[in-house]
């Protein structure tokens, strides 16, 4: 989710323009590069409007590819680790085809992103579009929304307010968390790469359980929060960790910011936000 307040510093730049547009409708601009990042990515948000979510994934991809075709622009698709579903291979390599539910509550996002990838490859084959496909794993950092709905923001806000930290399931499910600055570097390197379309995993390969993450955040915030456990949602993956061998080889990319530093930066941001 974006926030216009984050762009206040560049609004006066004559080379910068904000255009508010729903990509489920065609867009007519003259353009050189397209970064297709438009889609709700938190389960709380995409499950609230699953039809719009899958339209954004699929119609959005078609419309942005149509724009790229007309303008001969290079286009990057922000795909997701969720295309691997609840993986049977660990860590996940780009060659893994996934184990994804087609009718569960997460399918609007997971299958929407899978379909978008297919459309990108078809446009490349049929229309020779210059495409780039990245698969983003869990990412966090300053400027996340308070109501983002994912574990890092949820846990930090609950800890700063000394409220119970809610874990869904037993907390043994694992994730790997990439700091936003590292992700942005990977995205830029991918867009600038030559003769490489992807797909490529972009994420931090250091794995952690959700329970351990909660405990780290409690310690870093000095919170009196207690951890409580609730029922695990349907189709929630048991583990998620990227194999980034291709990113290292093709992009010379590897995450640099460790979790302790990244969490401290994110905690400071949310602390300031809550106090304001």
Where are the predicted features?
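C-terminal substrate-binding subdomain of Rossmann-fold SDR/epimerase-dehydratase oxidoreductases
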Residues: 21, 138, 157-276
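Residue-level signature of the cytosolic catalytic core of signaling kinases
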Residues: 12, 104, 144-148, 206, ...
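Gly/Ser/Thr-rich beta-alpha loop segments that engage phosphate groups in nucleotides
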Residues: 4, 62, 87, 143-145, ...
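Residues that form or flank phosphate/diphosphate-binding pockets in enzymes
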Residues: 2, 29, 146, 208, ...
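N-terminal Rossmann-like NAD(P)+-binding domain of SDR-like oxidoreductases, especially those catalyzing
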Residues: 1-139, 181, 265, 269-273
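Conserved donor sugar-nucleotide recognition element shared by glycan-biosynthetic enzymes
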Residues: 108, 116, 148, 210, ...
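Nucleotide-sugar-dependent glycosyltransferase donor-binding/catalytic pocket residues
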Residues: 54, 144-148, 176-179
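Glutamine-centric residue-chemistry signal
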Residues: 77, 126, 144-145, 158, ...
């Amino acid at each position: 989710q974006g926030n216009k307040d984050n762009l206040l510093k560049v609004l006066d730049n004559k080379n910068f323009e904000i255009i508010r547009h729903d990509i489920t409708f065609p867009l007519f601009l003259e353009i050189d590069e397209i970064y297709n990042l438009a889609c709700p990515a938190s389960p709380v948000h995409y499950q609230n409007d699953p039809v719009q979510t899958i339209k954004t994934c699929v119609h959005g991809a078609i419309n942005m590819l149509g724009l790229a075709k007309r303008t001969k622009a290079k286009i990057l698709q922000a795909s997701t680790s969720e295309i691997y579903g609840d993986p049977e291979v660990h860590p996940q390599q780009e060659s893994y085809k996934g184990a994804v539910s087609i009718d569960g509550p997460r399918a609007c996002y997971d299958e929407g992103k899978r379909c978008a990838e297919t459309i990108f490859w078809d446009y490349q084959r049929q229309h020779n579009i210059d495409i780039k496909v990245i698969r983003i794993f869990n990412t966090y950092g300053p400027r996340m929304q308070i109501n983002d709905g994912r574990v890092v923001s949820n846990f930090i806000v609950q800890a700063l307010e000394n409220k119970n930290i809610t874990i869904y399931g037993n907390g043994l499910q694992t994730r790997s968390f990439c700091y936003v600055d590292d992700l942005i570097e990977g995205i830029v390197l991918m867009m600038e790469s030559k003769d490489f379309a992807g797909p490529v995993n972009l994420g931090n390969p250091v794995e952690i359980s959700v329970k351990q993450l909660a405990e780290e955040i409690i310690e870093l915030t000095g919170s009196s929060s207690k951890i409580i456990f609730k029922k695990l949602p349907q189709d929630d993956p048991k583990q998620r960790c990227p194999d980034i061998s291709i990113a290292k080889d093709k992009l010379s990319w590897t995450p640099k910011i460790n979790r302790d530093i990244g969490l401290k930066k994110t905690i400071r941001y949310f602390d300031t936000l809550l106090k304001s």
